[in-house]
From Swiss-Prot:
The gene is HMO1. Keywords: DNA-binding, Nucleus, Transcription, Transcription regulation. GO terms for cellular component: cytosol; nucleolus; rDNA heterochromatin; small-subunit processome. It is found in: Nucleus. It comes from Candida albicans (strain SC5314 / ATCC MYA-2876) (Yeast). Induction: Repressed hyphae and in biofilm. This is Transcriptional regulator HMO1.
Amino acid sequence: MSDLKTTKDTLVSTLFELSKAAQDAANAAIEFYKVASGGSDHVSAEQLKAVSEALNTVATLSSGNGAKIEATESKKKRKQEKDPNAPKKPLTMFFQFSYDLRKKIGIERKKKDLPSLSAIDMNSMIKDRWDSISEAEKAGYKKRYDDAMIIYNIEKKKYEESLKDGSAYYPPPSVQTPIVGHGIEQDFDDDATDIVSSPEEPKKKKKKTEKKEKKKKSGHGSP
């Protein structure tokens, strides 16, 4: 903390020195314009504009920029102080549904030795499925979310108390258990599984053909 304060004070001091140097440069510019114009005290509008812009730059460096730097340091400090053990909010209904469906599709495609779907295809399938699920299925996801929020609020209170009294806090493994919902189990096989299983049919036929050919060869080879 002391190092941060020292470096900040050094930065502020440097900015003030820069401000003073810029002011001196502006005054020197005015004197230069006077000499260049033959010693006349008259300064043109363009010259005054150039000096004004220089002074505005000084003001920005000495005040606004310092405030921005301090705000940036404060923001970085808040990010660094975020505790990874702090309880995390549960997934919303849609994101929990998305998690479940992604897991279901991944399992089905892995069983069939199929490559993963592209992000576009996966997101499109998830959106279509979410738009078509029944109110009862959505109610099931809402209940899961509400139950998870109850646990989250309890854990959040425990965590805040541990910060006050200095006691240890041990977060639960997961506030929201990522299990596949009943709605996906019931309806997924009717439509999405067709996408998963259809490319597999040629493989099955090929395996049967290979077995028949092996039997024929073994039959010819026997006396």
